[in-house]
């Protein structure tokens, strides 16, 4: 049954909303070229906040001569980190509530967080190997707590969300220290979407009050496929953005529906999709030639067409199953996302539209996760256990 614990439901939805905000804000930081505005991690030029006063700026410039302070950008990156840290605390609270009835799993979560927490100052002290080992052990403990959990309630998903959030912190660190490596930046975007999807699932599972409806149950598998296809398309979108290939086909009428005025321009798929290019290269601005970037842009378009057709079919099936409002919302989101994507190309990637395009992908993910939740109905064992049941659960 859905939990009657209002504070828990409120916590779940606040965490979900903050995850969506972080996706949007992270896109803003990346697209405004502020991703490397704080060259160290988790501090910013060695400070908890960022240098503002002239003396502090001069000291920071001396310490990082290759990355002079740009105060109009540093605040964006560091406030993004603060928001991410806040989300981490909210997800930790969810995971602790989820595991409170089981001493073993609760202990695993606490041990994992302690190890990861110790790893951060170790990393700052340049003990990179020790920090990496501690983080890896912590992640393994969280994954064990999630995947070795018998049953499929919201509780294990809450723990899995915590594991993803902790790995997201590592990706955020590597984004800076590995100089915007495309596979890391793209992985960071996917991790953010995964976090949002998991938190949305948790929020729905502890809130939904619809009984199981056999009319919509058959949509579950189709919705799962829809989520997978959308995740693949989000990867292509992140790969396009992180390789600075959004405008590879030009700007204006010659950029869409054709590319550089051609239906099949010169493309280098091999170079465009080399996922790992080593460490030490500064990827800001992109390093690929025009043919490789064009290949990335065109594959993103092909993927968009395939996802659009499938998700529109899924919306039609949802409408036939009685979920008319949900079907209309999904179809409208698809049309909006396509319009935003075309506008990005034709108008030359305006910041507001580019950020909205990322937000549109997140809203599509939310719509699909909501559909998944509605196909399952009320979860019989998802609510908060009573105090009298906790001792028995703790023995498991």
Each language-model region and where it sits:
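N-terminal signal-anchor transmembrane alpha helix
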Residues: 10-37, 228-240
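Interfacial helix-loop-helix junctions of multi-pass membrane proteins
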Residues: 28-40, 127-133, 169-189, 240-254, ...
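Extracytosolic (periplasmic/ER-lumenal) interhelical loops and adjacent juxtamembrane/interface segments
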Residues: 31-78, 246-293
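Hydrophobic cores of alpha-helical transmembrane segments in multi-pass inner/ER membrane proteins
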Residues: 87-93, 133-145, 192-206, 306-312, ...
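Transmembrane alpha-helices
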Residues: 97-153
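Membrane-interface helix-loop-helix junctions at boundaries between adjacent transmembrane segments
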Residues: 151-157, 171-194, 198-199, 205, ...
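A juxtamembrane structural motif centered on a specific transmembrane helix
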Residues: 204-218, 222, 367-396
């Amino acid at each position: 049954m859905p939990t009657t614990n209002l504070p828990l439901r409120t916590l779940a939805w606040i965490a979900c909303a903050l995850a969506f905000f972080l996706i949007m804000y992270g896109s803003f930081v990346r697209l405004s070229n502020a991703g490397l505005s704080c060259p160290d991690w988790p501090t910013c030029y060695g400070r908890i906040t960022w240098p503002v006063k002239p003396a502090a700026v001069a000291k920071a410039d001396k310490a990082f001569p290759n990355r002079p302070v740009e105060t109009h950008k540093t605040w964006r990156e560091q406030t993004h980190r603060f928001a991410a840290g806040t989300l981490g605390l909210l997800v930790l609270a969810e995971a602790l509530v989820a595991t409170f009835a089981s001493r073993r799993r609760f202990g695993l979560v606490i041990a994992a967080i302690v190890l990861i927490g110790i790893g951060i100052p170790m990393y700052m002290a340049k003990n990179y190997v020790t920090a990496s080992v501690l983080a890896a052990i912590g992640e393994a403990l969280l994954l064990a707590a999630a995947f070795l959990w018998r049953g499929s309630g919201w509780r294990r998903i809450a723990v899995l969300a915590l594991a993803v959030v902790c790995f997201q912190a590592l990706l955020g660190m590597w984004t800076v220290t590995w100089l915007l490596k495309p596979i890391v930046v793209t992985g960071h975007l996917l991790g953010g979407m995964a976090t949002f999807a998991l938190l949305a699932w948790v929020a729905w599972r502890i809130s939904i009050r619809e009984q199981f409806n056999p009319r919509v149950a058959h949509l579950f598998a189709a919705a799962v496929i829809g989520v997978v296809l959308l995740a693949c398309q989000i990867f292509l979108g992140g790969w396009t953005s992180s390789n600075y290939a959004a405008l590879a086909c030009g700007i204006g009428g010659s950029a869409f529906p054709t590319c550089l005025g051609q239906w099949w321009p010169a493309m280098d798929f091999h170079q465009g999709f080399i996922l790992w290019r080593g460490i030490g290269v500064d990827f800001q601005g992109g390093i690929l030639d025009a043919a490789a970037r064009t290949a990335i842009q065109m594959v993103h378009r092909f993927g968009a067409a395939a996802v659009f057709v499938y998700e529109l079919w899924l919306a039609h099936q949802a409408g036939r199953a009685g979920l008319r409002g949900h079907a209309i919302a999904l179809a409208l989101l698809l049309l909006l996302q396509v319009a935003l994507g075309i506008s990005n190309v034709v108008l030359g990637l305006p910041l507001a539209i580019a950020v909205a395009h990322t937000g549109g992908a997140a809203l599509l993910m939310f719509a699909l996760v909501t559909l998944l939740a509605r196909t399952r109905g009320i979860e019989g064992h998802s609510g908060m256990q009573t105090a009298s049941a906790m001792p028995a659960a703790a023995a498991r």
